[in-house]
Each structure stands twice: as structure tokens, then as C-alpha cells.
Amino acid sequence: MESLDRRRTGSEQEEGFGVQSRRATDLGMVPNLRRSNSSLCKSRRFLCSFSSEKQENLSSWIPENIKKKECVYFVESSKLSDAGKVVCACGYTHEQHLEVAIKPHTFQGKEWDPKKHVQEMPTDAFGDIVFTDLSQKVGKYVRVSQDTPSSVIYQLMTQHWGLDVPNLLISVTGGAKNFNMKLRLKSIFRRGLVKVAQTTGAWIITGGSHTGVMKQVGEAVRDFSLSSSCKEGEVITIGVATWGTIHNREGLIHPMGGFPAEYMLDEEGQGNLTCLDSNHSHFILVDDGTHGQYGVEIPLRTKLEKFISEQTKERGGVAIKIPIVCVVLEGGPGTLHTIYNAINNGTPCVIVEGSGRVADVIAQVATLPVSEITISLIQQKLSIFFQEMFETFTENQIVEWTKKIQDIVRRRQLLTIFREGKDGQQDVDVAILQALLKASRSQDHFGHENWDHQLKLAVAWNRVDIARSEIFTDEWQWKPADLHPMMTAALISNKPEFVRLFLENGVRLKEFVTWDTLLCLYENLEPSCLFHSKLQKVLAEEQRLAYASATPRLHMHHVAQVLRELLGDSTQLLYPRPRYTDRPRLSMTVPHIKLNVQGVSLRSLYKRSTGHVTFTIDPVRDLLIWAVIQNHRELAGIIWAQSQDCTAAALACSKILKELSKEEEDTDSSEEMLALADEFEHRAIGVFTECYRKDEERAQKLLVRVSEAWGKTTCLQLALEAKDMKFVSHGGIQAFLTKVWWGQLCVDNGLWRIILCMLAFPLLFTGFISFREKRLQALCRPARVRAFFNAPVVIFHMNILSYFAFLCLFAYVLMVDFQPSPSWCEYLIYLWLFSLVCEETRQLFYDPDGCGLMKMASLYFSDFWNKLDVGAILLFIVGLTCRLIPATLYPGRIILSLDFIMFCLRLMHIFTISKTLGPKIIIVKRMMKDVFFFLFLLAVWVVSFGVAKQAILIHNESRVDWIFRGVVYHSYLTIFGQIPTYIDGVNFSMDQCSPNGTDPYKPKCPESDWTGQAPAFPEWLTVTLLCLYLLFANILLLNLLIAMFNYTFQEVQEHTDQIWKFQRHDLIEEYHGRPPAPPPLILLSHLQLLIKRIVLKIPAKRHKQLKNKLEKNEETALLSWELYLKENYLQNQQYQQKQRPEQKIQDISEKVDTMVDLLDMDQVKRSGSTEQRLASLEEQVTQVTRALHWIVTTLKDSGFGSGAGALTLAPQRAFDEPDAELSIRRKVEEPGDGYHVSARHLLYPNARIMRFPVPNEKVPWAAEFLIYDPPFYTAEKDVALTDPVGDTAEPLSKISYNVVDGPTDRRSFHGVYVVEYGFPLNPMGRTGLRGRGSLSWFGPNHTLQPVVTRWKRNQGGAICRKSVRKMLEVLVMKLPRSEHWALPGGSREPGEMLPRKLKRVLRQEFWVAFETLLMQGTEVYKGYVDDPRNTDNAWIETVAVSIHFQDQNDMELKRLEENLHTHDPKELTRDLKLSTEWQVVDRRIPLYANHKTILQKVASLFGAHF
């Protein structure tokens, strides 16, 4: 079988014959798998060959589920192949058939029937396809039968080929032959097509061949692949081609699968066949068992596209049905047919103007009214755009083209013309999205589902510009709850502009943010997010502690634990642990919000669980944290702009980002975090600056206000934790710190006054010191003394004096009075040190915020000066212990002497308060780090030179101390100029050394001669080594160290002011909390504190000035004031942004572009106005000419004048319109063009009958239409009372028209109609079909449409209004399988008053009452109905009666509702069950078109909204 297949396919190229012209109906579609250059992206799943296991699965699955078609009976055809061989009717030769197909000659002469002679067999062509001589491009291919179910092909593509479900189908159709496009237009098309496919995750479906529009698409994908990287995305291009038309297809036949199959692209030898395009990624090759027959793939492709478009795809957290759009380039008759079918199926089409032929014809007439699209106009356009084949067009074809183009243009909502350079359509991707939105907006839906669908598309594709201009308009008022699902989707997919848009359109975060929403957001963090990994660690730790097998579910207290690590332990948990962690909540492990596009309310799918508190304390804070931890810059900025406690929020975000940046491994992400942290710090500075300018006192309150939302911390504490030096160095904050530093003293007091009062405190009573509060000036002496000595500045200086006294006493004891038995001075030092120990202990255990001992210890030892204090105290204790033991007295004194150095170093902390010396401490710290790393470099040279020198000079030195001296110590001193005297041999002396190294106080002598008086080592070598060592160590390395110091100094010096201002806070805070008495008198304060805490159990008081808990009302007022000033800050920022030169240039450019567009539009309007005026003038001249012609003719007939000299006043016009056509053109076009439209649809409903095309101008019977030859169709109906079936007038001879014919009323509301050859003629004109069609009677078929309405009322009973007008509700019904509703009416039985359908939904006992209501109703319409079932000889006429219930308590209304039922029990055996509902009257109600017109008249009758 395999060899036969190969032989058969091998001769297909030579034996092809009679190839039909290809139908250019190639639709296209692009997937969104990430793709780049194949040589760089070998790991891509569809470019890599399947693994052996996958190949085996595919080799077994495809033959079982996918078939091919083979001709099993050879029936000789009358035609020969191109090589002159006999072929079968299928197009293949004898050799290309199976053995069972070769039958005796008895089968010859019989007609070949594909239904009998073609059978399905397991396919033998599938696998990977490799195009030879074209690098290493690899695709997928499969040969399928034309009857293969679409679901099987879809399963193959998504499950076995591994394609992601598309977000969009782009069906590209157009010219099947090569055509030329402008370079710019070609570039725009290629770029836009690939862009929309790559960014939206679309599939592009084309015909797959290497010609025409398919080649254009392939080249677009190729260009993208060559210029992109693996990360930029992959474009999936699927070619659906006919197997029997593929050149060189024999190489694709592999019964067990080709992995890979090589395919040669041979354009020169393809003949009438076609080659596959090498730039397509997947091929579906449709087989019907024939050879050389084009268009076989069209039905399967149409079904496949329809099947895929009915699937649901989730994108950006939103589930929508996969939309489809048709993109048209160039094309011929087949393309026109494809566009026509797409428009009729509701598929939006994008026509690329400038691509040629059909596309340009449609683009040229798309803006014209349908009445102006005439046969002559289309003929003129065809002569321009189809110059080569215009002569082959017949009159029937031109009429058909005119009719189809009229129907296409009539549905403008589905037609989008892409014009190069058109405003708002700079690229094809914008045109495609606009086409989908325009089509969606035109659909009929109840309520907001239609707008919701449009918004889903815009969010899924991240096109906020179109959403702003096309969706959020005055046509629909969005409710905030309707936007909540979209808001969640925008947040998860990081689309900040949509978040801003939703906030602008009414979304309130307090209503949007719930516990379930937050959990949804946190559960859907990106796995690469650092916060996500931290959460996983917390959950794993909880699982470990609980000895649980499964990972616990995420709760907000887990998030709070991670946040506390980032914010610092000065904050409390933002989300406390709930009492019941297993409370009911939504399971949101997947970020998708299930939203069905077709008529399901968003609100019904976005309900929160009830029974517990759902809303958070501060929703803006919660969203802000979520955005910040993911480093979403724009999103965080938008949410911060909504925050109330904005200064604290900005500082907290700065802290979180800086902490995350320390752990982030990705350098780029870390830098972005730091940049965003700086941005938030600047925002905090900006808001605080506005507040401080407005009111200094209230601004300073903001600094120390306890923020409940941010863990009961303060703005100042957050800034310090985040090390926001710029914020802390702000003038307002420094003024506040200065105020705290001076306590209740005036800042104007000089330091010398403070010191004098400390030395002579009675000066306090003389007014020598001034206080901030005037009341202290007049208070009694104790209050003034207390205020003075409690000021931090006084406490600081008193402690300085005390510390200097301690150091002096310590030095005195060490140098003068260090006795075997301690003196009173030494005992005083012990007491002094004990007071220092007590103070350090107090600082360690002081925990007013309840952080815990371990955390307080961690915070305590995080300070360098505290470490130094502890080290000095411990060293003192060690020295004291040794000192008290007589045997270790001297070592004890040494230890205490070293300890004195540490106590002296502690003095540097005092310099922090100095603006000059404070930054220098930082410089010293950083230089010490520089020295530490520098020593590693220096050690290399020191050790290398020292070892070499020691080895050259000294032989076998065994004393370790002298080795160390020779290698390290002497080498180190050499750097500073202490060069050994003997190294050059000049000052060599044996007296200064020990020959054998026996003298412990002398070094061993260098190598000497046998006399021992002269050196034996090479002096030149040691001198050379010394010079090199000094060059590198003394010059190079020391200068490097100096340069490092200089860099450190310059770096710190640039930020001296900020560093000093930041440092002084720690000192101020320390002395603000210290007891007022200095050591050792501080022991009294410690004793008092001990009694309060231990004995009296009095808790520690907070520092009121550094942490202030405000009353609720005061806090609310303060935050409102801050919010107001934040708005001022944001406005100033926007103004400054607009004043930037770059922004001004951009604004000017946009204004110039707008002005140019307006001028162009004005020119077009003027040109159009001129053309209209000329046409009007031409028509007036024609009328005058005809009038004069009539006058002349009348005068001549009356005997006035002779006919010989009469002038011809009616000249032959170029268009030569008859009078009837002139009257047609005078008609004003209405929405229905003035003619019946539905009655002229080419395909008759529920039948495979095609109407004869009837353009608008040929509708009236008076218009001459010589080629009019409509088919005849009369359906057989199972109703007894119907007219007979027949295409002749004989069976109808007994029918009497224009009268009441027995029980049938054949009179028309439009008067007497014409009866021609026994058939009545439709009074509205031609329809393109003769006969009765599916109607019951020839002539008029009368129907009744009751329009039952009532006012729409709210829960309170008041009438609802929209745009000032009252709103109506109408009673409608529909079949379960129908998408549209209808009025409860229809045809009536002869002699009956109520329609049949109305009787089925109304109980029989109410029929008489309803007839009474009909007689009392108001007739709103009576006449012809434009129905698709109408024909030339049968049509529908209706009477519409309005039945309105003004009062909701109307007894007849209640009876009507009681007697309505969903279906008639007698009709249970039928599939015609009707349902009824009350629906709001609106122009978008999904109602049949003719019924909607009636409903509009009823709304106008009552002045209601429509």
C-alpha cells in the first residue's frame, strides 16, 4: 500500500489536468505562541521534533481518528491529463489508484459519483514538515478527510500539537494569485497583523499556499521571526489547503508519520498546482479524493473556524468566546462571496484599501448611501480595478456583484475599512479591534451584556484608548458593581490604565476590595515574585509546625507575617489571625472570572460569600501593598493617588521595596525596586511639603500620629526604618526634631545659656532662660526647674559632663591611684559603671510596644554604639576580676587600660549632634571598611616579599617569633621607611645578630662567607626585590588606598547634610527617653522606675511627642486635610509635567495633526457638498428638459407648429435613466433603503434556494430588468388550509385576488395589487424568487401583532426613567432554540381573531377577554412587513395593536399574567415550546427587525424611552 501511494503521488505533478480556477476564500488565523529565529530557539515546542514517546502516541492516535479519502472505483474520464494519459473522473491515473479500484470494462461509461466511488481510509500523511534548502524551519501537518469533525481537528491542534487556545481568530482572505501592494501599505499590514496576533494570542488561518495573500502573511511572520527573540512571542499561522492541489506532496506520505518529512518548494515546476508556504507553522490538508480541484477546503475551514469561535477562552482573567474577524486583501469573485457570507454570519470584516480589486471596490463605495451604489457605479469600479478581466464579466455577474456589495455596505457595523494614515488606525491591529467592538456594539442584547462584551475585548487586548473612546460613552451608564470583575482582571494582568479608567468611571475601592478579592489577588501572584516565595516559606513553616501532610490554605495573616518582616517589628500585624481560619470563602486558586458573553449578568457571577465581614479596614492600603510587592510601578502610583493616609502609605511602600530589593537576585528588578522606593519617598516629601507650608503644627502632628492602618506606627518611624534620608532631612521634620531636642525651652536660647544654667541653676529663676509656652514663664520655680532639666538638650550636655568626669577619674586611677587595694576613687568608678550598666539594661528591656524580649534584644544589638557599650562593660568586668585577684593585678591593669580606649571611642557618638563632626563619623566607618578590603591586597605583597627576603637572607630560622618579625613585621615597617640596614650588605655586622640564633634577643645572622665577616647573599637581588616591593606597596597600593579614601569622603561629603540630619534623630530620640539625672545619679531614676514597674505594676509610658494617639474625630479631620493637600500636590505635578519642553512639543504636534485632519475633513465635506449641488442641478435640468419636451409634444399634437422643425429637448444622457428609475432615485433612503431588504436575501430561509439578485434600483416592477429570471419555489406545508403547489397558473385559476376569497382575505392594505399570468405581484417590488415560498397563501398573508406593554417600575412602585423618558416593558415570546424574541402574534386561521402562537401561550378561558382588549387597543401599524419569507407572489401584511396597562394594579393585567403559561400541553409532542417574558423596551432588545420597528412606534406613541 505504501509503495503504491508513493508511486501514485509521485506522478501527480505530471498527470494533473483540468485544474479549475482557485476560489480566493482563504481565511487566516494566527496563534500567540512565542516565536523567534529558529536557529536561536531550538527549544520551541512546535519547532522541535516530538520525543519518541509522543511520536508513538501521535502515530497511533491520528490513523484511528483522522481519515483520508481514496477513489475506489476507476471510471475513465473523457478528459486526458496534461501528459495525454487516461485518468479517472477523480483526476488520478491508473497507477495512482488502489488495486481494488481497477475494475473490468463493464464499469466504464457509468457516471462517477464521489459519494459512491470515494471512501475513507486511515490517513497516511502527518508529522513534522521540514522545508529543504530553507534553514531548519519545522512545522506540523496532517492530511484529513473533508468530512472530519471540527472537534477532532481542534483536539489535534490543542492537545497533540500543543497549541494554546487562541484569544482571536484572524481569517485572512483575498487574492490567490500573486499581486503587488505599495511598500508602505505592505509594511503596515505585515506589522499590524503580526502585532495583533503576537500581543493577543491569535491564530491566523490562511489557504497555506505560497501565493497571493497567503504568501503575504507568511512573509510577515518570517520578518517577525528574523527580528525577534524567543521571549517576544510566537506567531501561529495555520494553512488550510486542498491536498489534491499541492505540488510535491508525495514527500509528505508516511503511514507511520513523518518525523520529519522533507518538502521541496518548487515554484517553477508546480504548473497548475501550488506549493505550501514555508513560513506557516501548521498545515491542515483537506482531501476529498480528487486531484487538481480547488476549493475543497472551504467547507471544512468554515466549519472549523465556526467551531473554534464557539469555544470559550480566558484571557486577562476574563472568559470570552473566541472572537473571529475576517481581514481582506485584494481578491476576486470568490473573495466577494467570502465577505458576503461572513457579513451574513455576523463576522466583522476589515477591508484593506489600496490592496487592489475587490478590496478597493468595496472600500470605494463603503461610505456611500446604499441607494447610490448602482449597477452603473459598480460597473465603472470594475472597469477600473479589474481592467484585465473586465471584458469577461457578464451582465448577470455585474448585477450579482451590485446586490452583494449593497448588502455588505448596508451592514456597516460589521464593515471596517482600513486606510493608510487614517486617524486612529495607524495600524491594522487597531482596525481589527475597532471592527470587533463595532460589531459587538451593534448586536442586540438585554441590559448591559453587550457593553460588557466590548469591555471584555478591550481588557483582554489591553486597548484602553478604544475602551475610553468607544465603550465608556454617554450611551451606557456603567454601574460600579458591573466593573468589579473587569477591575480584578485588570489588576491581575497588570493593566494600570484600565484600573485608572475604572476608577474614573465609578469603581469604589471600599466596595470592591473584600477579603475574598484580596485572597484572589495574593493567590495569583506571579511565581517569579519574591513575595510569592516568601509566602510559600511561611506556609511551609506552618505545615512543618503543624505536622500536616497538605500545605495549608493561604490566609491574610500569612501575608501579614511577611509584611511585618518587611515593614519592621515596630509595626503590628496588618491582618490579625482570624478566630476561625476555615471560614467559608470563595476558592480563587485560578485568577479567571467566569463570564459568559452570551447574556449572563456579571453581577450574578461576582457575588461574595455572606455570613461574615467581607470588607477590609483600608482597601486602598491593601491594594497598594499588593501592587508594590510585585513592583508594579504605574499600578502602585494610581492606587496611591486614591489613598487617604498618603504620607504613611508612601513611606511604608518605600520601606517594603527597599527590603525586597535586598533579597532580589535579579539585578534589574532590584534596581527597579530601589527606583520605585525613591519615587515613593519623593511623593511623601511632596505631600508633607504641601502640608508644612499650609500649617506647620498640623504637619508635625502627621509625623507622630499613630496610624492604625499601617500597624500602629508613625510616619517618622516608617521613614527611619526605611532610611529615607531625604524625607528625614526635610526642613519641617528637622524643625520638629529641634523642637523635641529643646523640650519646653525656646530654640532661641543659646547653648552657653544652657551650660551656665546647668552650672548655676538659680539663674533659671531670673528669666535668663526663655520657655516656649508663656505659662511656664509665670509658673512657680519647681515647674521651671522640671521643664529645664527634662529637656533632651540639657540631659545630653549633663551626660557629656558626667562622661568626661568619668573618663578623667578613670584615667587618674589607671595612671596615679591604682593600688593593690581599691581606693575610694576606684570605688566611685565601680559605682559609676554600675549606673551605666543599669541604664543599658533599661534600654534593653524598655518595650512599650510589646515587641518581646528577643526582638528588643535584636533591635538593641543592631546599634553599633550599643555593641561598643556592651563590649566596654564586659571588658571592664574582666579587667576588674583580674584586678581583684592579687596574682593577676598587672594583667588586670592592662585590660582596664585597653578598656579605657573603648570608653574613649564611645565619645564619637556624642559628635553625632554636630553638623561638622557627625558626618565624619560615617566617613571613618566607611574608611575602616575600605582599609579592611585593602589589607587583602597589601598582604599579598607583604607576605610575598617577606618570605622571599627571609629565605634569601636567613638559613633555617626555627624561632617562630623571629620568623614573624622577618616576614611580616619588618616588611610592613619597610612601607613606612624603616628599611633593614643589612639588606644591601653595606652595614653588615655580625655583632648585631646571633650566628646560630641562640640569642633570643637578637635575630639570626644572614648568610655570610666562610670568614663570617662578609655577606654571602646576592646584594643586587635583595636590593632589586626591595625596590620593586616599595614601588608597588608604597607607591601603588598606598595611593590606591588614598584614592579609595578620597572617593568615600567625596561620596559622604555630597550628602553631609542629609546624613547629619538623619543621624541626629537617633541621638535626640535616645536622650528624649533618658532619665534626666546623669550617671551615677541616674541610679535614683532607675530605682524609681523599678518601684513603679515591679512593685506598683505601672506600665511604661510612651513618648508622647514621638508617638501620639489622636482622637477619632481629630484624626479624621487631619487625614481629610492631608488628602486635600495631596490633591494639590498631584495637580502641581501634572502641571509641571505639562510644562516640560518634551511634553509641550508633543502637545503641539498632536494639535497640528488634529488641525490637518480637520482641514482634510472640511475639504472632503466641501467637495461632497459641491458634488451634491451639481447632482441636484443636473436633476433639475433634466426635469425642466422633460417638462419642455412634454409641452412641445402637446403643442405639436394639438396642431401648433410642424413636427419637422421640433427640437429634441430631452438629450440622451450618459446614464439614460427611464422615468421609473428617476422616480426611484427621488426616494429618500430610510433605514431599509425605502425597499424591502430582508425579502431579497439571496439565501431563502430554511431552504437551499438562492434568489435571483435584485439590486435596489431594480426592485420596483416599473424598472426595466430584462435579465430578471427568478427561480420558483413553493414549500409543501402540513396545514390543511394552504394554496396549492405548482409553478404554473393552472392550479391557481380558482383563486380570486383582491377580494375575500372564501375564508381567506386576499385584500391588501396597499390597495389593489397586480395579477400577472395568474400570479399576484408583490406591491413592494421584486424579491428574486417566484412562488409561494414557505408562506401559506399567494398574495397577502395577514398577521396580527398585539403589543402588550406596561410601565417599568422600581421596588417602590415608581415608574423608572432613562434620559428623562419613562421606560416601558413589553410582553415577548421565543422558541427555546431561537436567539431572538418576538411579539406574541403571527398568522391567524381563517375566521379567527387571535394568532395561533398567542393561543399557545394564553389559556383558553382568557381568549375572549383578550379579544376585547384588542378591540379596545390602539392600532399603531397596518401594512407590509419586510420578511425574509416574502416572494414575488406571496408576502406578509400585519396589523399591530397596542394594548397598554397604565396601572400596575389593573385587574386585566393581573388576569393576563395569571393566564400566561410557558407552553401549551397539547404541543408537548412538538419541539415548538414557547416561553414568554416581560422585557424592557430598548433599541437593543434582541427582537426581530420588523417587530422592533413596530415597538418603536409604540414607544413613540407613549413618549417612552427606546
From Swiss-Prot:
Residue positions of motif Nudix box: 1386-1407
Q: What happens when the gene is disrupted?
A: Mutant mice display no obvious phenotype, but display increased blood glucose levels when fed ad libitum. After oral or intraperitoneal glucose administration, they display increased blood glucose and lower plasma insulin levels; basal fasting glucose and insulin levels are not altered. Ca(2+) influx into beta-cells is unchanged under basal conditions or upon stimulation with glucose up to 8.3 mM; Ca(2+) influx is decreased upon stimulation with high glucose levels (16.7 mM).
Sequence intervals crossing the membrane:
793-813, 825-845, 865-885, 894-914, 927-947, 1020-1041
* An example Gene Ontology molecular-function term: intracellularly gated calcium channel activity
Q: How is its activity regulated?
A: Activated by intracellular ADP-ribose, beta-NAD (NAD(+)) and similar compounds, and by oxidative stress caused by reactive oxygen or nitrogen species. Ca(2+) and PI(4,5)P2 are required for channel opening by ADP-ribose. Activated by moderate heat (35 to 40 degrees Celsius). Activation by ADP-ribose and beta-NAD is strongly increased by moderate heat (35 to 40 degrees Celsius). Likewise, reactive oxygen species lower the threshold for activation by moderate heat (37 degrees Celsius).
Provide the reaction this enzyme catalyses: Ca(2+)(in) = Ca(2+)(out); Na(+)(in) = Na(+)(out)
User: What's one GO-annotated cellular component?
Assistant: perikaryon
Name which cysteines form disulfide bonds: C993-C1005
Provide the binding site for ADP-D-ribose 1.
T173, N178, R301, G332, T335
Tell me which family the UniProt entry assigns to this protein.
Answer: Belongs to the transient receptor (TC 1.A.4) family. LTrpC subfamily. TRPM2 sub-subfamily.
Assembly behavior? Homotetramer.
Its protein name is Transient receptor potential cation channel subfamily M member 2
Q: Organism source for this protein?
A: Mus musculus
